[in-house]
Amino acid sequence: MMILTIVVLLAANILATPILPSSPNATIVGGVKAQAGDCPYQISLQSSSHFCGGSILDEYWILTAAHCVNGQSAKKLSIRYNTLKHASGGEKIQVAEIYQHENYDSMTIDNDVALIKLKTPMTLDQTNAKPVPLPAQGSDVKVGDKIRVSGWGYLQEGSYSLPSELQRVDIDVVSREQCDQLYSKAGADVSENMICGGDVANGGVDSCQGDSGGPVVDVATKQIVGIVSWGYGCARKGYPGVYTRVGNFVDWIESKRSQ
């Protein structure tokens, strides 16, 4: 998954994420190719090419990570949607405005949430283009819940090529307390604005560079509960992926969408 070195973004228009010993924008490690309709809310955020993921909230609004848009100019960005491929198919739409959370901290990667408003509306209710529902404000995941992470990130740590087709993986939620204890050894903090997921004992399943900003969806409720944010390496044993806790930002999201 992404790696937070407590430094910040690395090559914003290549992969954009926070880093530790690797880099933040993750892709899916240990997953499978997504099939039509598996993740219809997934979009590719692009400059000259794919660099982050995002999630469809409605015809105009995309949810992504703050670190993905940090320092970015809206006029240079577009999204591709309604396709399983980040480089072809579907439709591209230009970005009109970027709303980065006011309290985003690029050192701790806290409040890692942003909204993107599009210039023209998407055509939704297609097999690969549907909005994802938000959870209730203040809601949280439970240990052991199954969550689905998707994206076009690297398939393994140290890889430098993105898969052409969308990947997905279902993982288990890890307790915030355990996650914080594990990351404290690397000098990082897991806040109440974050959730964690993966296989702590064995590793092998995670997001990786290129997945940043993408959706983390509760398999049971189909609601978006997380945003791919950061991590230590990709799918490393003892280091679960860390995701923005969407439940803590629903009021913020709705306030921006109503402006």
Swiss-Prot record:
One GO CC annotation: extracellular region
Alphabetized CDD domains for the sequence: Tryp_SPc (cd00190)
A Pfam family recorded for this sequence: Trypsin
Subcellular localization: Secreted
EC number(s) recorded for this UniProt protein: 3.4.21.-
Protein name stated in the entry: Mite allergen Der f 3
Record-level Gene Ontology MF annotations: serine-type endopeptidase activity
Signal peptide: 1-16
Group of enzyme by EC: hydrolase
Propeptide: 17-27
Keywords, sorted A to Z: Allergen, Disulfide bond, Hydrolase, Protease, Secreted, Serine protease, Signal, Zymogen
Cystine residue pairs: 52-68, 179-196, 208-234
PROSITE patterns (UniProt xref): TRYPSIN_DOM (PS50240), TRYPSIN_HIS (PS00134), TRYPSIN_SER (PS00135)
Name of the gene this protein is made from: DERF3
Active-site residues annotated for this sequence: 67, 112, 212
Family that this chain belongs to: Belongs to the peptidase S1 family.
BP-aspect Gene Ontology terms: proteolysis
Residue ranges that the Swiss-Prot or TrEMBL entry lists as coiled coil: none
Protein's UniProt keywords contain Protease: yes
Residues the record marks as site: Required for specificity: 206
Occurrences of domain Peptidase S1 (ranges): 28-258
The keyword Secreted appears for this protein: yes
